[in-house]
Amino acid sequence: MIGGSIGLRLTAGVMLTALLVIAVFAIFSIRSESQSLLREVERHASQVSDHVKADLGYDMLHNDYQRIHAGINRIGQQESIDRVRMFNKAGEIIYSSDESDIGTMVDTRAESCYRCHSEGQPIEQLETSERTRIFRLDPDSPRMLGIINPIYNEESCWTAACHAHPESQTVLGVLDITMPLTEVDRNIRNSQLAIIVFAVSAIVLLGLVVSLLVRWWVDRPVQK
């Protein structure tokens, strides 16, 4: 009876400690994996945004509306892209892969804009983490990642004959690209499931090993 009581308490203590350690490990692993996947998506989104802006740069410089519109439509039709928009400094959408957006105004107090505006004035430079946002169109919709890329007034812009932008105007507009996170969220869920299965399996296996060791090294000697 005494041996069984000691063995039971010892087993319970070891299992409780193991459960706590493995649970903490699982939580941190899930969080780290999720953050790593999201950082990779943010990096990819930033590269896509820079590529799109560079690809449209020549057409914007020559104010070629048709080519800009065609380029944005082509990019917006890609499976990994949800929508591509370009709006001017005033917040009016002038190009979009969704034509119903064109001509509408963006709320500068919305999440996609507030990082660029401080008391109504856009800041000059933004880090990648400050240019991205994660949101849902509605509570039941999949998550989306959006990235904004300010279009700065370079010398080739304010010296071009077809443009009327003064040299003092720093930001001409913003390129906004949104990408679905459906695949990323699926990978996150799979990783979470794998970590949970590993944690549960480790706890069960450790419990069996501890029970056998306690029975062999504690219960049997005490009974003798």
Where is each model-derived feature located?
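Extreme N-terminal signal-anchor transmembrane helix of membrane signaling/transducer proteins, especially
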Residues: I2-R31, F198-L206, V210-L213
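Cytoplasmic juxtamembrane amphipathic helix immediately C-terminal to a transmembrane segment
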Residues: S34, V210-K224
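Extracytoplasmic/periplasmic helical hairpin
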Residues: D55-A110
